[in-house]
């Protein structure tokens, strides 16, 4: 959005001058300007809002001689419109009337009281319940990047020092922020192109000294040594920018942001961006959540548990001790069936994590307090359930849950059973909590009895049987008489309102009572709001302990969920080994087995020091990619403490999981399919180690046969002999099945199929040894390729096979050609011009000789 020109404000009306001044301060976001019961937008904001929200674009008179484009939304519907805007990455400044229209001379005083951006949301109605809502900042140094994320809705603050663009891309994929701040000199914009909420920030917001001061002030510490982050210079600069941005948008204290942690890649199995994408961990290739690992594993009782599970999936642990602690807890929950009762108890807790953030920001609503009260009421019952368990990790979590009897009793006394949505209309504070409030309410609530008595008395006094006493918000209390009987009213009746068939009156007595009641209502509401504000002060001293309660409850939820998933889906506890290797018996793809219409065929895999690479061959559609992915997913599941989809699994140390599976053009970066494939392959060859699990699928298919085969052969050879990584290498180049004859530790496996006449049945079973053919024409027929095309293809295949030469390494008789023959390309012949140039000594040439030589080289080339 273009900045607003405020140089010539005098030509505008006073109200538009006020609007333009505020808009100039928030030029990069939509300004919702409160006017009565509507939020209005003007000029470019109105046009943009009309386009984004589908609301009418009109005009509001003129200002400065020009019509003013205008659009508006009702104030009571604002949350729905805000939700739409933040989902597309749009930020909004909300400007409210804070002055009294009755006493204002000129425009009513207004102020921006709230700024809503995608990454700073805390309102329950605007947040995705089961997804973290991360605000991120990235700062580029001379070498490497600083990266910081903050979840304002929970207070979780994390930084990471990243050496390369590839590691930054992986972090962006892992964290998936909804809003990103980046410095002016950031030059890797191709990594951010698909993020909707991008904000360019001035360089000074990333200043190191300023960042340190901001963080120290936020945490209330003298230094950052206690957080173990003093050497993370670049990410601290990013964190400082984040902190300033959140302070600017929230405009209040942020006590729930009380710590910062550093994400160390050495603590977790490294997953690059391609691997996270290809394995469809929490997001499928279409951008949704269906048919992902998270969708299968997530039956958590709480939203905060669901969010923690997704973080675990993206951060598989390397430390076997931590994994074993989780496994032991899950195993005990499963054996004792305690997960069943825990699930029901946890379900009633609600999203305490986000409730505590709203409490800290003082934006909590009455129902947040009611949910917190319910959670604290359930806590003793939860503690009692955990007291029956002895797994060390479960015991530790039980201790972290804490005890809050005073806060529970306070909320029980203070908040009604079913509070309204908002505090503004009262009715939140329970009767008996405050004597003065009860007194004012008594005056107000006694009005009904008084009016009934007054009506009866006046009917008797005046003899008017149709006389009624009533009330409305506009005219207050009144005595209503039909027009025909209005001649009978006493002299002390003062006409207040004339209707078609009725006259309404007020008496001095009724007027006095009205003032008394309205005064008591106003005083009751003011006192109730004061007591409401005091509740925050009484609860917030326990903020940190309540946050720890939320984290412990979320982790209990994940562990209980793992136990339930193991029982329901038939998972087993994997064994952790100190020896390098992966051994899986009857492994199943955890996602495919859930969506498959037919029984899933379980398959084994064995990788160890003497069997480091499997060359996987078989027909297209035979299940090679599914087989490889299931090995990676089972390995990952084992490292988050989850039981796995196999009869048995023994997993050794893993430092990284790489996948090179499938490819498509990267249009945003201008990279072809083959370029994407080679970039991912290069990343694997540069970074894989002997403890890495590598999945390579169809390397080289994006180029010519000889180029592709050469690259696939060389990549496999390098992985097997130079790196020694545990590798599954699927290929359609049958020549690669000769690798086991040439290299130690390389073995062939294949997925079987049975051919009958022109049909094919995929067995999906992994067998030792190489496949015999790929069944390409049969698969094409199954895919619906017209019969005429299939017939022509068979004819062409027969012609090619009949020629006296080898096609893709296959002899005329159908046997494989020696790979040495296939790769024995003719030595290149050097160009005569190059030979001539190499023989020249330029120091011995005269200018005339140099010119003659130039013409000679031109002729030779």
UniProtKB/Swiss-Prot annotation:
Protein family per UniProt: Belongs to the DNA mismatch repair MutS family.
Gene label: mutS
Cross-referenced InterPro entries: DNA_mismatch_repair_MutS, DNA_mismatch_repair_MutS-lik_N, DNA_mismatch_repair_MutS/MSH, DNA_mismatch_repair_MutS_C, DNA_mismatch_repair_MutS_clamp, DNA_mismatch_repair_MutS_core, DNA_mismatch_repair_MutS_N, DNA_mismatch_repair_MutS_sf
Gene source species: Shewanella sp. (strain MR-7)
Name under which the protein is recorded: DNA mismatch repair protein MutS
Gene Ontology MF terms: ATP binding; ATP-dependent DNA damage sensor activity; damaged DNA binding; mismatched DNA binding
Domain of life, source organism: Bacteria
Biological role stated in the UniProt entry: This protein is involved in the repair of mismatches in DNA. It is possible that it carries out the mismatch recognition step. This protein has a weak ATPase activity.
Gene Ontology BP terms: mismatch repair
One Pfam family named in its UniProt record: MutS_V
Keywords: ATP-binding, DNA damage, DNA repair, DNA-binding, Nucleotide-binding
A single GO cellular-component term on record: cytosol
Positions that bind ATP: 618-625
DNA damage in keyword set: yes
């Amino acid at each position: 959005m273009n900045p607003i020109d405020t140089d010539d404000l005098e030509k505008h009306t006073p109200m538009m001058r006020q609007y333009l001044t505020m808009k100039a301060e928030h030029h990069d976001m939509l300004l919702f300007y409160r006017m009565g019961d509507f939020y209005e937008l003007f000029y470019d904001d109105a046009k943009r809002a009309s386009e984004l929200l589908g609301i009418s674009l009109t005009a509001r008179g003129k200002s400065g001689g020009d019509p003013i484009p205008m659009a508006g939304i009702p104030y009571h519907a604002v949350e729905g419109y805000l939700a739409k805007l933040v989902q597309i990455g749009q930020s909004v400044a909300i400007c409210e009337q804070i002055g009294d229209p009755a006493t204002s001379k000129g425009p009513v005083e207004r102020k921006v009281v709230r700024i809503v951006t995608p990454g700073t949301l805390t309102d329950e109605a605007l947040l995705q319940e089961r997804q973290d809502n991360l605000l991120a900042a990235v700062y580029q140094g001379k070498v490497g990047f600083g990266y910081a994320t903050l979840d304002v809705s929970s207070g979780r603050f994390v930084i990471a020092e990243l050496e390369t663009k590839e590691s930054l891309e992986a972090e962006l994929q892992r964290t998936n922020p909804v809003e990103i701040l980046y410095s002016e000199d950031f030059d890797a914009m191709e990594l951010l192109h698909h993020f909707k909420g991008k904000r360019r920030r001035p360089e000074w917001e990333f200043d190191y000294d300023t960042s340190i001061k901001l963080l120290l002030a936020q945490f209330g510490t003298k230094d950052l040594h206690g957080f173990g982050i003093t050497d993370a210079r670049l990410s601290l600069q990013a964190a400082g920018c984040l902190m300033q941005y959140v302070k600017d948008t929230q405009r209040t204290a942020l006590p729930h942001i009380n710590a910062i942690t550093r994400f160390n890649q050495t603590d977790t199995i490294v997953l690059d961006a391609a691997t996270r994408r290809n394995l469809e961990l929490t997001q499928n290739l279409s951008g949704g959540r269906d048919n992902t690992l998270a969708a299968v594993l997530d039956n958590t009782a709480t939203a905060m548990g669901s969010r923690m599970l997704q973080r675990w999936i993206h951060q598989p642990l390397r430390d076997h001790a931590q994994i074993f602690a989780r496994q032991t807890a899950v195993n005990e929950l499963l054996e004792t069936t305690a997960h069943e009762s825990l699930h029901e108890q946890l379900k009633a807790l609600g999203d305490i994590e986000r409730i505590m953030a709203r409490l800290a920001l003082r934006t909590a609503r009455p129902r947040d307090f009611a949910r917190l009260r319910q959670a604290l009421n359930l806590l003793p019952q939860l503690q009692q359930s955990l007291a029956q368990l002895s797994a060390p990790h479960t015991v530790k979590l039980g201790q972290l849950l804490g005890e809050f009897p005073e806060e529970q009793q306070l909320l029980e006394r203070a908040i009604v059973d079913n509070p309204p949505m908002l505090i503004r209309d009262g009715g939140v504070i329970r009767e008996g909590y405050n004597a003065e409030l009860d007194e004012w309410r008594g005056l107000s609530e006694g009005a009904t009895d008084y009016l009934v008595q007054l009506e009866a008395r006046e009917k008797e006094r005046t003899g008017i049987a149709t006389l009624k006493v009533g009330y409305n918000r506009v005219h207050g209390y009144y005595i209503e008489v039909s027009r025909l009987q209005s001649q009978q009213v006493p002299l002390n009746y003062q006409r207040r309102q004339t209707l078609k068939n009725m006259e309404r009156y007020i008496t001095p007595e009724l007027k006095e009572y009205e003032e008394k009641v309205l005064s008591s209502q106003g005083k009751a509401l003011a006192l109730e709001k004061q007591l409401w504000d005091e509740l925050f002060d009484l609860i917030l001293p326990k903020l940190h302990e309540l946050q720890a309660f939320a984290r412990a409850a979320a982790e209990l939820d994940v562990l209980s969920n793992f136990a339930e998933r193991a029982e329901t889906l038939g998972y087993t506890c994997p064994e952790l080994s100190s020896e390098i290797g992966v051994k899986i018996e009857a492994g199943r793809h955890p996602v495919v087995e859930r969506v498959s219409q037919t029984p899933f065929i379980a398959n084994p895999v064995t990788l160890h020091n003497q069997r480091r690479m499997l060359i996987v061959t078989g027909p297209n559609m035979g299940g090679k990619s599914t087989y490889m992915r299931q090995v990676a997913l089972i390995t990952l599941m084992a490292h988050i403490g989850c039981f796995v989809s196999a009869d048995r699994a023994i997993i050794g140390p893993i430092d990284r999981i790489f996948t090179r599976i499938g490819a498509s053009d990267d249009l945003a970066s201008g990279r072809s399919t083959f370029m994407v494939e080679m970039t991912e392959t290069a990343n694997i060859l540069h970074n894989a180690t002997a403890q890495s699990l590598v999945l390579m699928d169809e390397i080289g298919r994006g180029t010519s046969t000889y180029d592709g085969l050469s690259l696939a052969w060389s990549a496999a050879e390098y992985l097997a002999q130079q790196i020694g990584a545990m590798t599954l290498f699927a290929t359609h180049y049958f020549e690669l099945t000769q690798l086991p004859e040439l290299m130690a530790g390389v073995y062939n496996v294949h997925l079987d199929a049975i051919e009958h006449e022109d049909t094919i049945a995929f067995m999906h079973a992994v067998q030792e040894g190489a496949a015999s053919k790929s069944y390409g024409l049969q698969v094409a027929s199954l895919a619906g390729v017209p019969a005429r095309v299939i017939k022509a293809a068979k004819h062409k295949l027969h012609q090619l096979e009949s020629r006296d030469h080898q096609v893709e390494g296959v002899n005329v008789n159908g046997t494989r050609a020696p790979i040495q023959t296939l790769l024995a390309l003719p030595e290149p012949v050097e160009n005569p011009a190059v030979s001539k140039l190499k023989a020249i000594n330029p120091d011995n040439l005269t200018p005339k000789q140099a010119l003659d030589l130039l013409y000679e080289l031109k002729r030779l080339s």
